[in-house]
Amino acid sequence: MEDKKCDITTFGEILIDFTSQKPNEDGQMLYARNPGGAPANVAVAARRLGARTAFLGKAGKDMHGEFLRSVLEKEQVDTRGLLLDEKFFTTLAFVEVQESGERTFSFARKPGADTNIQKEELNLDILDHTMIFHVGSLSLTDQPARDTTFYAVERAKKNGSIISYDPNYRASLWRDEETAKIQMRSLIPYADIVKISDEETELLTGYKQVEEAAKFLHQQGVAVVAVTMGEHGAYIYNKDGGVKVPGFAARQIGDTNGAGDSFWGGFLYRICYAGKQLKDLTKEELEEYVRFGNAVASLCV
């Protein structure tokens, strides 16, 4: 592949995660403000490993949007494609973290700035010169972001980028499950690489078993499929078949928020520097990349 200005460009939601903490002495629940949004997290994770990354998206021109931009700039992620819009608020997510590390979400996004990005607002200098273009599914919940997502994916693919897709399901952001299923599946024909969790396999493919789901996606034209399985690691599938790759023990059981994004940032980083076309990568090489991603994720828990 010809040299590109960016190794990985991500597009989609950037938001604030207000993550639950221990109650104060009066019993009031406290929340910590953290930068969030799966695509933005992936860009940061890959940049920390040394990849050249950029983010395309929109936040509000408010205290939260300014904070998010400063975080990406501090992490040395290219922010020329991050717009701050005074007409819309930055999306907020309230995250309840259980003792097990599992999470429940509530969103303030009616509408959020991230759902109001127009295709005319995309930074084409970045979009047209990236090796990997990564998107999620939360930009498909509302217009105009949905049309902008398809425009960006089609343009990047035409320009030779590898399309990476993470259908990240958040039930409360969709009108109903059937709508989510239709929209989330609509990007699969464009994807070269797909990451899903074992909780999303049935929704996205109709198959609950990770092996069957991965095989189905590969038959739909996806070259590489990764299914994350929490503490049990991940399952990787390509033309050579599939293999389960065990995870690493976390330093301690805690907040799992962002672990999957860190895994994917690590995996895409290895894809970037493989020195091979995606179709030429062996199952053994991909297994090594998954192991690397698992190690990165374990450091985030």
Annotate each predicted stretch with a short phrase.
Residues 44, 92-96, 233-236:
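Short beta-strand scaffold segments in enzyme catalytic cores
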Residues 2-7, 154-155, 210-301:
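Conserved phosphate-binding/catalytic region of the ribokinase-like
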Residues 47, 73, 154-158, 188, ...:
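Anion (oxyanion) recognition and catalysis
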Residues 162-167:
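Short beta-strand/loop segments at the ligand-binding rim of alpha/beta enzyme cores
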Residues 110, 138, 168-172, 199, ...:
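Active-site beta-loop-alpha junctions enriched in small/polar residues
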Residues 1-78, 117:
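Glycine-rich phosphate/adenosyl-contacting loop at the front of the ribokinase-like
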Residues 52-135:
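Conserved N-terminal subdomain of the carbohydrate kinase-like
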Residues 159, 173-244:
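Conserved phosphate/ATP/ADP-binding segment of small-molecule kinases
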